[in-house]
């Protein structure tokens, strides 16, 4: 719930590329976690898969405590996300999203068909 709320409130400027979770650069929501790893005084992340081995237990604890409303954990909470996160501004069911894709597809095919007439 914490990360979902952050995603719905985020825009492209709220994302960063960071090696802090996996050891490979991944786009994530900016958080106190990514800021700490980006600090000039921070250690360099380990190579993959070692960074994941290091960060996974910590992220699991952060996620668990964030779901209970722990303020510090909420600030640290992050997840992988693309720059298009700004397009996600309200919660939708998967069913609704699939139907919207289908409607958009039908409209696109109709427009294309009209250009071929």
Put a short name on every predicted segment.
Residues 1-117:
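Conserved active-site-proximal phosphate/metal-binding subdomains
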